[in-house]
C-alpha cells in the first residue's frame, strides 16, 4: 500500500482502482489514504462482496464508485471508469464554484472567511500578527460605462493578476464582489504598510485593454490582527472603514486602522500617502459607519 501511495503522490492519474481483497489493501482505510494522497484522482473500489453498507461507506470516504467482482465485464468496467472520472470532474467543478471567483480565479468571500479564521486561530496560539487588506478600485465604473462590461471584466482579471504578483504565494488574494478585493497577509513582520503600498503602486499603473489604455487607482485599508479586531467580521469592518478613509482623503492611497477601543464608538486611522509610504501623516478620527 505504501508503494501505491508514493506513486499516487508522484504522478497524476485519472483513476485508481483499489481491490479490497489484496493483502495490503487494509479494507476501506485504503480509500481514505488514497483520497489524501491523490485528491484529484477518481477512485473505484473493487470488492468480492455485494454489500450496500460497505458501498455506501466507500462513497462517503471519497470513492466515486464500487464494483462487485461477480458483475465485472469489459464493457461494464469501461463504463464504470468513464463515469467515475466524469463524476470526479463534476465534483471538482462544483468545489471550484463554491470556493473561487469564476471571473478572476481568486478565492471568493467564503474561502477568504475560512482562511482568515484559520490564520487568526494560528496567530492567537503563536502570539503573531497578521493583516487584512481591503482594496477598492477608484475609477472602475467609468471604465465600465465608457468601454463596456467586457472591458470591465478584462480590467478585473488584470487587477487580480497584479494583486497576485505583488504578494507572496502564501498570502490569500480574494475578490469580494464587484471591484472590491481583499488580501490576507500572514507573518508581516510588523510592516503591513510595505505590501499595502505595493498594492497602491501597482494599481496606479495604466492597464491595456485591447486597443485601449485606461487608468484607475486603488484605495487600500489595512486592519492588523489583533489590534484592529479579533474576528473575521471585525477585521473586515476595520479594513473597510480604513479603506473608506483612504478613498475620501484623495483616492489612490492607503490607511491603517488604529487599535480598536472596545468602549469607544470611533475608530482611529493614520493615512499613508503613496509618495511617503513609511512616513505616516497625523491620525485621523473616523466615526464607525
PLM region descriptions:
Residues 6, 28-40, 57:
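Short amphipathic alpha-helix used as the core "switch/output" element in two-component signaling
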Residues 76-88, 115, 119, 242:
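Receiver (REC) domain switch/output surface
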Residues 68, 173, 198, 208, ...:
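Cyclic nucleotide signaling catalytic output domains
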Residues 1-15:
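Acidic, metal-coordinating helix/loop segments flanking the phosphotransfer/catalytic sites
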Residues 90-107, 121:
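Amphipathic HAMP/coiled-coil signal-transducing linker helices
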Residues 108-131, 138-168, 174-178, 182-186, ...:
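Conserved long alpha-helical elements within nucleotide-processing catalytic cores of c-di-GMP signaling
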